[in-house]
């Protein structure tokens, strides 16, 4: 069912809340109690524990450097796909991650499937892993799986063996049916076995990573107990630290509580100077990015995630969003996003999942303004940027290369689209919610017309009349067609055939004009005189019973070169009706005269009602 077909009538199963209001609920809050089964769910402090950290320090921290990144698209992301990656798609993803600058890449769970095993062997045997890139392989804390993992990695230069077991209250009780002692022993036994087996593969630089899976559902004191025991077995040093990964396997709490738990571990873990503290946030509550940022401020050193937030359920934390959030704060993410469209295209191909239009930084619509006030602010912001490097210039008169080193300050655009390989063509799009700013921007950037501010309201009303009548969006071509129909193509009641202008030769002499016209279907020739070509033409039209008073005039070059064109805009009161006219021609003079004719026809065309300037 398409979105357009989805709403037929109000769904019968939705029950409008009519229950009692909360005790103490203020009178201005009209919400009512719902029939949702709230009694089935426990708050985090009851389900797990109430983490108390009154002297927390993370709220005062700032993110000033990027973390160590680890991309888990090829494992955690891949396992969540409807159609898991083929070997060819895995290669494409791996090559993309390397090209972007990731130095730690989780490449699979080689003991879990032959496909993953074969892929790990392929990238090792074909020399696809750069010397400064470390591959990471995932394995459960079981002996036969651990041995198979080492077999898969034989011959690799740098490998992180990532072993894990779940430590949460729920999984201990429901899945494994083990007590705390048994769960801890499972972890330490795996650590001892891994350390022993690694001795059989001396040519590889082995590093270790342990995750108390479902960390967010684990009491922090117990998580520390298990982690400390594993660290004691692996015996890391400050020169050769191990990674302790604290996964929000299921996001269960608000980001501030997650940050408290990270800071608690950061403060209390034994041998902290020999530990790289890592985060692995998921997005079940929709706050994975916030949790990662606050957790990083709370003492973490490293973050695992996926491009565009792929992963089980609602996905892993989005590394694109995290990294580009840092860029907007002047922090180098140490990853390259200069062609985000290519990155997105590759990810969509590999995952066979579309990146939503509203996904931060990468979606089709994230740099697009439809709202009139937003469009006006963006338009003015871009012009202000241009004026910084060339006083008085508009955004169409200054190249992006000239702006490249200028501080970015444009309302509603937290990042310059061109810094990530996007362009300005789709920054402003017009629908029924748009205003003069958006219309003016498109006419300026796409069609070279700098519509005067006082005319922008009039033309935006013309465009809005179309969107109100027809619905949907008005693209650039459609907008030009509307403009041409409204201002350039009218030939009734006056059509210009030929104009001969003689400019004044002295200060006290008038300009003169001879105008060959078709007026109400008849060929006519009229003469006029005035203190300039426009006044002379108005005088000529007066002889046809057309009273024209020029009230505002603007002009500019539309194009340059041998075929240069000029554009002129005239606000005129024609027989008591105030309208704008527009002319485009090879010279300013003839463009201006065309603009007067345009205004006359818009005011007097009985077959086509014009939008009047200023509502007159």
UniProtKB/Swiss-Prot annotation:
Domain Pyruvate carboxyltransferase per the UniProt entry, residue ranges: 67-341
Pathway(s) of this molecule: Amino-acid biosynthesis; L-leucine biosynthesis; L-leucine from 3-methyl-2-oxobutanoate: step 1/4
Binding-site residues for Mg(2+), renumbered to this chain: 76, 280, 282, 316
Cofactor(s) in the UniProt record: Mg(2+)
GO CC annotations, alphabetized: cytoplasm
InterPro entries, per the entry: 2-isopropylmalate_synth_dimer, AIPM/Hcit_synth_CS, Aldolase_TIM, IPM_Synthase, LeuA-like_post-cat, LeuA_allosteric_dom_sf, LeuA_N_DRE-TIM, PYR_CT
Presence of keyword tRNA processing: no
Deletion phenotype: Lacks 2-isopropylmalate synthase activity, no longer grows in the absence of leucine, increased lysine formation when the appropriate leucine concentration is supplied.
PROSITE patterns assigned: AIPM_HOMOCIT_SYNTH_1, AIPM_HOMOCIT_SYNTH_2, PYR_CT
Catalysed reaction equations from the record: 3-methyl-2-oxobutanoate + acetyl-CoA + H2O = (2S)-2-isopropylmalate + CoA + H(+)
Pfam families with a match to the protein in the record: HMGL-like (PF00682), IPMS_D2 (PF22615), LeuA_dimer (PF08502)
GO biological process terms on file: L-leucine biosynthetic process
EC number: 2.3.3.13
Regulation affecting activity: Inhibited by L-leucine, the pathway end product.
Region (Disordered): 1-34
Other notes: C.glutamicum strains classically bred for lysine production are leucine auxotrophs.
Complexes and interactors: Homodimer.
Annotated protein name in UniProt: 2-isopropylmalate synthase
Gene name linked to the record: leuA
């Amino acid at each position: 069912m398409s979105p357009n077909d989805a709403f037929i009538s109000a769904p019968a199963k939705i029950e409008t809340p009519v229950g009692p209001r909360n005790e103490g609920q203020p009178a201005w809050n009209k919400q009512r109690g719902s029939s949702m089964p709230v009694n089935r769910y426990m708050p985090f402090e009851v389900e797990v524990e109430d983490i108390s950290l009154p002297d927390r320090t993370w709220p005062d921290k700032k993110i000033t450097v990027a973390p160590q990144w680890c991309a888990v698209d090829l494992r955690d992301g891949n396992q969540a796909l409807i159609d898991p990656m083929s070997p060819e798609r895995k290669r494409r993803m791996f090559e993309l991650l390397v090209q972007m600058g990731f130095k730690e890449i989780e490449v699979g769970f080689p003991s879990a499937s032959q496909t993953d095993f074969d892929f790990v062997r392929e990238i090792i045997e074909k020399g696809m892993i750069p010397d400064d890139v470390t591959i990471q392989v995932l394995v459960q804390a079981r002996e036969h799986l651990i041995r198979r993992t080492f077999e898969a990695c034989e011959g690799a230069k740098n490998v992180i063996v990532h072993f894990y077991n779940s430590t949460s209250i729920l999984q201990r009780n429901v899945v494994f049916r083990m007590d705390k002692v048994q769960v801890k022993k499972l972890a330490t036994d795996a650590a001892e076995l891994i350390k022993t087996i690694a001795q059989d593969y001396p040519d590889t630089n082995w590093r270790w990573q342990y995750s108390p899976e479902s960390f967010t559902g684990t009491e922090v004191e117990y998580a520390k107990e298990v982690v400390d025991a594993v660290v004691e077995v692996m015996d890391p040093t400050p020169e050769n630290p191990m990674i302790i990964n604290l996964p929000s396997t299921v996001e269960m709490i608000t980001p501030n509580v997650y940050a408290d738990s990270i800071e608690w571990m950061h403060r209390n873990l034994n041998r902290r100077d020999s530990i790289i503290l890592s985060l692995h946030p998921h997005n079940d509550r929709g706050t994975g990015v916030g949790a990662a940022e606050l957790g990083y401020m709370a003492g973490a050193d490293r973050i695992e995630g996926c491009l565009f937030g792929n992963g089980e359920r609602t996905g892993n934390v989005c590394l694109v969003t995290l990294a580009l959030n840092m860029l907007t704060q002047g922090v180098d993410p140490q990853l390259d996003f200069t062609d985000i469209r290519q990155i997105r295209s590759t990810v969509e191909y590999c995952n066979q999942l579309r990146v939503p239009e509203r996904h931060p930084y990468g979606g089709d619509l994230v740099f697009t303004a439809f709202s009139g006030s937003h469009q006006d602010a963006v338009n003015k912001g871009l012009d202000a940027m241009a004026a910084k490097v060339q006083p008085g210039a508009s955004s169409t008169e200054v190249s992006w290369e000239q702006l490249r080193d200028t501080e970015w300050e444009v309302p509603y655009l937290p990042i310059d689209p061109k810094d990530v390989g996007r362009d300005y063509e789709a920054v402003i799009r017009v629908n029924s919610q748009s205003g003069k700013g958006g219309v003016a921007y498109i006419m300026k950037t796409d069609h070279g017309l700098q519509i005067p501010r006082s005319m922008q309201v009039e033309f935006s009303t013309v465009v809005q009349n179309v969107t109100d009548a027809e619905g949907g969006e008005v693209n650039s071509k459609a907008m030009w067609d509307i403009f041409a129909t409204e201002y350039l193509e009218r030939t009734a009641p006056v059509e210009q055939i030929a104009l001969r202008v003689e400019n004044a030769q002295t200060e006290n002499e008038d300009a003169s004009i001879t105008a060959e016209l078709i007026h109400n279907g008849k060929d006519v020739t009229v003469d006029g005189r005035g203190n300039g070509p426009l006044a002379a033409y108005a005088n000529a039209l007066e002889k046809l019973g057309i009273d024209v008073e020029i009230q505002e005039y603007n002009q500019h070059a539309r194009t340059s070169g041998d075929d240069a064109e000029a554009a002129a805009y005239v606000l005129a009161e024609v027989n008591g009706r105030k309208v704008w006219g527009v002319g485009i021609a090879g010279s300013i003079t003839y463009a201006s005269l065309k603009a007067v004719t345009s205004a006359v026809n818009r005011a007097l065309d009985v077959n086509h009602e014009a939008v009047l300037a200023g509502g007159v």
